[in-house]
Amino acid sequence: MSAANPETPNSTISREANTQSSSAATSQGYVLPEGKIMPNTVFVGGIDVRMDETEIRGFFARYGSVKEVKIITDRTGVSKGYGFVSFFNDVDVQKIVESQINFHGKKLKLGPAIRKQNLCAYHVQPRPLVFNHPPPPQFQNVWSNPNTETYMHPPTTMNPVTQYVQAYPPYPNSPVQVITGYQLPVYNYQMPPQWPVGEQRSYVVPPAYSSVNYYCNEIDPGAEVVPNECSVCEATPPSGNGPQKKSVDRSIQTVVSCLFNPENSRLRNSVVTQDDYFRDKRVHHFRRSRAVLKSV
């Protein structure tokens, strides 16, 4: 009779595993995670820090021969409050789970041991940690259309000459503060000289010409050139009866001043430069002004 219904240990373990798997979802009202149920192993939760493995082994020895007691601890060696008890022989794990066990005045939380990702766990399901990295900072060109796409703004190159830096306060929706450099244009003004009232001075400022040589056939190339001082007459107010002011302009001591002097009419075939030519015209202007004042 017994040979007709042989029962092997493997068939017993599979039947027990199927029984535990069917009742795992309702063990003491807790929702168990999915995974492989370890046979002959009980999850024990609610372990007090004062309990050690020896006491737990002695307590569960009444249900069968205890193979191993494992209390889960952290890196510092402190108990996390749960562990596992495994047996050598086949035990009724469901009967142990359904029993109300109080140890040292504290109720233990029992359940089937479930292995997931090579770790034994009861009610803790590992979840991957997701880190939300902040987006890279983006800068928007304040001079372009706001509807255009954003891009990385290059560093502003500042001119070292005459800079004015104006910092705009950041707007509520603006990610960064933009500093814009302005360069003030430099203007060069040439103001005419201011003379006192009553004095009239007329000077001819020559434009920038290229170097031009003027030749005079009335100059003797072998004659000696002697600088001469030309007197400059300054006009006086027509209403005044005071004497005329005379001053000597020593800046006009050129070779050209001797060309139009009657005493030096013997000079011939001398070369006259551009600067001498315009200074000569200035001497003629002074002399003509003096002649007009004398006639008045």
UniProtKB/Swiss-Prot annotation:
The keyword Nucleus applies. RNA-binding protein, which is essential for gametogenesis in both males and females. Plays a central role during spermatogenesis. Acts by binding to the 3'-UTR of mRNA, specifically recognizing GUU triplets, and thereby regulating the translation of key transcripts. One of its GO terms (cellular component) is nucleus. It comes from the Eukaryota. This is Deleted in azoospermia-like. Belongs to the RRM DAZ family. One of its GO terms (biological process) is 3'-UTR-mediated mRNA stabilization. The lineage of its organism: Eukaryota, Metazoa, Chordata, Craniata, Vertebrata. It is found in: Cytoplasm; Nucleus. The modification Phosphotyrosine is found at Y277. Signal peptide: none annotated. Residues 167-190 form the DAZ domain. Coiled coil: none annotated. The gene is DAZL. Residues 1-25 are annotated as: Disordered. The keyword RNA-binding applies. Keywords: Cytoplasm, Developmental protein, Differentiation, Nucleus, Phosphoprotein, RNA-binding, Spermatogenesis, Translation regulation. Residues 80-132 are annotated as: Homodimerization. GO terms for molecular function: mRNA 3'-UTR binding; translation activator activity. Residues 40-115 form the RRM domain.
